[in-house]
């Protein structure tokens, strides 16, 4: 097939020909129950601040930051393989295996005491299980919605915001009372209950269609320029986004917040992120996902360079957590909708996973780079902030280029 013909086929999904049994319900009990189950599946939390202050206090923040960095890398790099398995076999076995691995990893973290043990449990095992839940959850929601797709995906993604809001508070409250081990076990049991709901409710509306195996299946998405530009945007934005998330707590302590209040910055960030995932999702269904993504990426860059960089106060740290949480939450929620817009439904798992694998390098290197920049600046955060701001700005530029390419340069168009 001619590459240009193939490109037009995948880049104009709004004009795809109807196929038998492929009408999108865009609502109803089954469709919204999938959203509820996917929401439960994305309920996760962040524990790095505790590692730095307690279990791994003898190690530098840069060294400890490899735990979330490797964790995100594993979740992203496995995307193409999990996505391909979803396209070929459906979500059922992936969700079951993911549940077992995710909970097992948290249980093993509860009895860990050495750095390598946290790497194995929290940076490899648990994220691998989480990936087997995350990609099928997003992909299944996509098969049930079209007109309300961005809203449905935003509600789904807000599950991680709620988890990120609640779990740090739970952890901070429980650790002094029952210790780190039982706190992690309590979180694992909580997630097990939620993941059972995910296993019972999340299903794809489209029957799996086994396709050819081999490296070509994973490289084909890169024959589309719109996919390449969108993936580059996600890569640079992710590089800029993960850094402030990783170092938000330590920065709060740096500007004078108490340990407990600095810990609540994560909850503030995630609560705001939840709003940023749902409200812009509703707007994106009206004006276009790419248009909303450009606006959100622009705001993120402004908040980074115009607020976090010049602000050196406790108030500015709190304000940044809230505002950046909102804008970055939009990115998290709308990214799957962007890929769905330029992809065939039957390949949504593979193409989504391939995009996230492209972002895995950013996930792996962003946090360690941030830690190294802090050390090179003598404990100051200004180099980290400038670097993150430049990455966010580059991501914004590539979102604009992707949008202009898709619309053939037309400015006032829903896309």
Curated annotation (Swiss-Prot):
CDD domains membership: MFS_MCT_SLC16
Domain of life: Eukaryota
Ranges for region Disordered: 1-22
Keyword Cell division: no
Glycosylated residues (UniProt): 199
Alphabetical list of InterPro entries matching this protein: MFS, MFS_dom, MFS_trans_sf, Proton-linked_MCT
Gene Ontology cellular-component annotations: membrane
Biased composition (Basic and acidic residues): 1-18
Transmembrane parts of this sequence: 27-47, 63-83, 93-113, 118-138, 151-171, 178-198, 227-247, 264-284, 290-310, 318-338, 354-374, 386-406
Record's subcellular location: Membrane
A Pfam family recorded for this sequence: MFS_1
Protein family (similarity comment): Belongs to the major facilitator superfamily. Monocarboxylate porter (TC 2.A.1.13) family.
Protein name: MFS-type transporter FVEG_12626
